[in-house]
């Protein structure tokens, strides 16, 4: 019997709540997803910002996009690890026995990962504003930036969920996504 779209939406909502509650019960998940980018912003914005010469603008304005992308990669690692954990512990097999949509589990993991990424992005932007980040953006520009961040968060989290599905261990899932965490450091996002 085919499930209706309402049932799929409800199943996805239940799986999202389950995944997000798991994140809340493991405070280190949210803490590391927010504290590491926070400390990187403070470190690069204050210590390295005072020794680098980027011309006529503030170094903090230069590094905010790189740290945001780095934090999205880091926050998505938890989605991959949670999917792999569910698969290795047999939780996905239990869900297969229930009458829930097969895609609801993946939508739930993706939604929780996107929320973690957006929380991390908000912490970075607030920290950057405190440290002197002064973007020349209007309301429409901010709205477009938030939509773009949402799209990047969704895309990277979907990649993380896929990596979590193909990984055989939680550690392997984290390792598969390490390039997403380190890629901004290898780009020109930190060095002018």
Stretches found by the model and what they are:
Residues 4-11, 19-89, 117, 121, ...:
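Transmembrane helix-boundary elements of multi-pass transport/secretion proteins
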Residues 25, 96, 101, 168-169:
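A helix-boundary/kink motif common to multi-pass secondary transporters
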Residues 83-112:
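Helix-loop-helix units of permease transmembrane domains in multi-pass membrane transporters
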Residues 102, 106-178, 182-187:
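Alpha-helical transmembrane segments and their short interhelical loops
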Residues 188-192:
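Metallo-beta-lactamase
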């Amino acid at each position: 019997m085919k499930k209706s779209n309402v049932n799929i939406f409800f199943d996805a909502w239940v799986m999202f709540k389950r995944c997000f509650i798991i994140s809340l019960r493991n405070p280190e998940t949210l803490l590391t997803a927010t504290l590491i980018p926070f400390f990187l912003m403070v470190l690069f914005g204050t210590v390295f910002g005072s020794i680098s010469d980027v011309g006529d603008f503030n170094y903090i304005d230069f590094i905010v996009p790189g740290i945001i992308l780095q934090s999205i990669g880091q926050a998505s690692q938890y989605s991959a690890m949670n999917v792999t954990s569910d698969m290795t512990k047999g939780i996905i097999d239990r869900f297969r026995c229930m009458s829930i949509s097969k895609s609801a589990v993946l939508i739930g993991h993706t939604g929780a990962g996107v929320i973690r990424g957006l929380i991390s992005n908000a912490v970075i932007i607030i920290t950057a504003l405190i440290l002197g980040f002064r973007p020349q953006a209007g309301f429409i520009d901010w709205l477009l930036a938030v939509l773009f961040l949402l799209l990047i968060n969704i895309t990277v989290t979907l990649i993380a969920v896929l990596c979590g599905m193909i990984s055989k261990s939680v550690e392997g899932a984290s390792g598969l996504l390490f390039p997403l965490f380190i890629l901004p450091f290898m780009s020109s996002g930190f060095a002018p």
